[in-house]
Swiss-Prot record:
Gene: leuD
CDD domains the record matches: IPMI_Swivel (cd01577)
Pathway field: Amino-acid biosynthesis; L-leucine biosynthesis; L-leucine from 3-methyl-2-oxobutanoate: step 2/4
GO molecular function annotations of the record: 3-isopropylmalate dehydratase activity
Protein name: 3-isopropylmalate dehydratase small subunit
Length: 191
């Protein structure tokens, strides 16, 4: 998993509440188990009209938001099914963090497990962030738990264990591999 310490990127506001995992990545695209390739179909039913013709009315298709890597959204983001593919699609598209009012518990944990930082903020802060220019960079400082903007700095909470995992780029396999020598020694001893 890629380390997440201090990240700078531009943002795109998709301020709907209750964006569910089927809207993030529709079920017809869940046939693969590799984490790559899902970004093309992110928000498929909103982004495209037919045959991948871009919907000019969907904000991610606006040229000024094409390189956004921070998604700002409303409450209850990632509700619906438990598909991990939703986090994969957001990451594969290029998002590194989501700033929303709240998340479904399963999506929140799936995002963290895949190195995608879900940040909770109150509606007042979300509304302020949507006023930023599409070209203005936002800094996410995970060690200090801050969102840094020209409008001010906004603190966020994160479980210290997840914070440590993200800062060190450790998923569950990475954590296990830290004990590789001890595991090998145990296996040698108990053959």
């Amino acid at each position: 998993m890629e380390k997440f310490t201090i990240y700078k990127g531009t943002s795109v506001p998709v301020m709907n509440d209750n964006i569910d995992t089927d809207q993030i990545i529709p079920k017809q695209f869940l046939k693969a188990i590799d984490k790559k390739g899902f970004g093309k179909n992110l928000f498929y039913e909103w982004r495209y009209l037919k045959d991948y013709d871009e919907n000019p009315d969907f904000i991610l298709n606006a040229p000024k938001y094409k390189k956004a890597s921070l998604l700002i959204s409303g409450d209850n983001f990632g509700s619906g099914s438990s598909r991990e593919h939703a986090a994969w699609a957001l990451s594969d598209y290029g998002f590194r963090a989501i700033i929303a009012g709240s998340y479904s518990d399963i999506f929140y944990n799936n995002a963290l497990k895949n190195g995608l930082l879900p940040i909770k903020q109150p509606r007042e802060v979300l509304n302020q962030l949507t006023k930023l220019s599409s070209q203005e960079e936002i800094t996410i400082d995970l060690p200090h738990q801050l969102i840094i903007t020209s409008l001010g700095d906004f603190h966020f909470e994160i479980d210290p264990i997840w914070k440590d995992k993200l800062i060190n780029g450790l998923d569950d396999i990475g954590i296990t591999l830290q004990y590789e020598e001890a595991i090998s020694a145990y296996e040698q001893k108990n053959q």
